[in-house]
């Protein structure tokens, strides 16, 4: 279900790049199961939820989805394989360097996302606390900012409760078979 067809924008990661990767639900093998960004309208809804309406939308949806897949691979990798092509997103051609605009919100959306990703991947404290939700067909990413680093679920109310309900159901089923 896409954002433009009434799916709620959930921002659980606290980092732009992670919330961008979380615009899809993922299978364990990395296949997109539930796509939230199918068109420009979906992208606009997501950007509004993040208050990024000033960011320019230069990239196509296809390019953004390719970037999302690349970022997810980088986040789930060993952390040492920071793909140099990420830097291509934030290095404009010299012909575009005619004036300097220091207003971050006016940068292209893909640049903002990549800057956020580089920040996570280059900070060992952030990267070490990066987790993937184990919920069935979820695969969302988040930084575990709890004091004891024991956060397990993207959102306890959804994935955590589903897991608990499945365990309870299995337990009751086993008891009934006895």
Model-assigned labels for residue ranges:
Residues 113, 125-169, 173-178:
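BZIP DNA-binding basic region
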Residues 1-132, 139-140:
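Short helix-coil boundary/hinge micro-motifs
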């Amino acid at each position: 279900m896409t954002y433009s067809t009434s799916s709620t924008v959930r921002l659980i990661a606290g980092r732009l790049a992670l919330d961008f990767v979380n615009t899809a639900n993922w299978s364990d093998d990395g296949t997109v199961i539930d796509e939230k960004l199918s068109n420009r309208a979906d992208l606009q809804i997501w950007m509004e939820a993040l208050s990024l309406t000033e960011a320019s939308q230069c990239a196509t949806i296809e390019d953004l989805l390719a970037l999302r897949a690349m970022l997810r691979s980088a986040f789930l990798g060993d952390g040492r394989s920071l793909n140099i092509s990420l830097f291509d997103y934030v290095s404009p051609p010299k012909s575009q360097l005619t004036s300097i605009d220091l207003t971050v919100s006016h940068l292209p959306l893909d640049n903002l996302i990549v800057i956020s990703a580089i920040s996570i991947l280059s900070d060992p404290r952030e990267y070490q606390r990066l987790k993937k939700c184990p919920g069935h067909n979820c695969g969302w990413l988040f930084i575990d900012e709890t004091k004891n680093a024991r956060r397990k679920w993207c959102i306890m109310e959804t994935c955590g409760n589903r897991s608990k309900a499945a365990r309870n159901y299995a337990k009751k089923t086993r008891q009934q078979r006895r």
